[in-house]
């Protein structure tokens, strides 16, 4: 199945407990509500957070309670993005969401030291990534050419389209992501998975020792409540 983008290394989600993941997603929903309000249709960050929460099994009722509770919760949550150069120049981006920025930075500095890495200047790592929207969908009796025609005729900026026996992997630019999903639903496609994701424009090879260091770093980040996601471009 054409999952080369959907399974690209970002966070080691398979190793992360579902409870921990749901806790982080609930925090992400709360931050989105505080920043842009509780109207999902008018708040893109909240829309993405809710999509992810539903995909990870959080019930619609739990999400509604979280949204309503977040409107009344006085806790201030701050978003942070740290860029890092790791072993052999591998680029790493850490997205944090915390009520205690000093705690987050202190913990992250410890993880970076063990990785034998260093903090990078803003955009020195991000420049090597591009945000794209990705959807993995069942064929729904469409040929590849028919799907391409459907997307183009609806002004979807298609970047890539992969196909196997029963599925398409559709890759679009980030501004087209929600329009793509609406179009797929309207045409009765079964969406198996979808997300907005930073895709590396170039990749870096690591040796076994460097991979071990990187995996330890990723595991530490996964266990840290203040860290939401980690993106890297290691093979």
Swiss-Prot record:
One of the record's GO cellular component terms: cytosol
Keywords: Cytoplasm, DNA-binding, Transcription, Transcription regulation
Any one GO molecular function term: DNA binding
Family: Belongs to the TACO1 family.
Protein name as catalogued: Probable transcriptional regulatory protein MPN_478
Entry annotated with the keyword DNA-binding: yes
Membrane spanning stretches: none
Compartments reported by the entry: Cytoplasm
GO biological process, one term: regulation of DNA-templated transcription
Cross-referenced Gene3D superfamilies: 1.10.10.200, 3.30.70.980
Organism: Mycoplasma pneumoniae (strain ATCC 29342 / M129 / Subtype 1) (Mycoplasmoides pneumoniae)
